[in-house]
Curated annotation (Swiss-Prot):
Organism: Xanthobacter autotrophicus (strain ATCC BAA-1158 / Py2)
Disulphide bond pairs: none
Keyword Nucleus (UniProt): no
Record keywords: Cell inner membrane, Cell membrane, Membrane, Transmembrane, Transmembrane helix
The protein, known as: UPF0060 membrane protein Xaut_1380
Length: 106
């Protein structure tokens, strides 16, 4: 259940943060904050379904998924195509997340 939880968490976190961004940076209605708060709460709840021994490890591994999901959001929602540096950074983060998730534990 870890990957679906990570993906749901990413959607919740990105949508919630974008709602705040929309209000503060783009001058959107403060009503955007209501779904933003709900989205951020859903993000936090989703991470409780990650199969990990410690919350910190789950959060650290999630970081790679969050970064990749943020770039997909940027491309599909905001219409800004990621460049090679975005892709390189995301690949490095996913590699780090894979080490955290799949590394041998004694």
């Amino acid at each position: 259940m870890t990957l679906p939880a990570f993906l749901f968490a990413a959607l919740g976190e990105i949508a919630g943060c974008f709602a705040v961004w929309h209000v503060v940076r783009l001058g959107g209605s403060h009503w955007w904050l209501l779904p933003g708060i709900v989205s951020l709460a859903a993000f936090a709840y989703a991470l409780t379904f990650v199969e990990a021994e410690a919350a910190g490890r789950a959060f650290a591994a999630y970081g790679g998924i969050y970064i990749l999901s943020s770039l997909v959001w940027m491309w599909t929602v905001e219409g800004v195509r990621p460049d090679r540096w975005d892709a390189t950074g995301a690949a490095l983060c996913l590699a780090g997340a894979a080490v955290i998730v799949f590394g041998p534990r004694g």
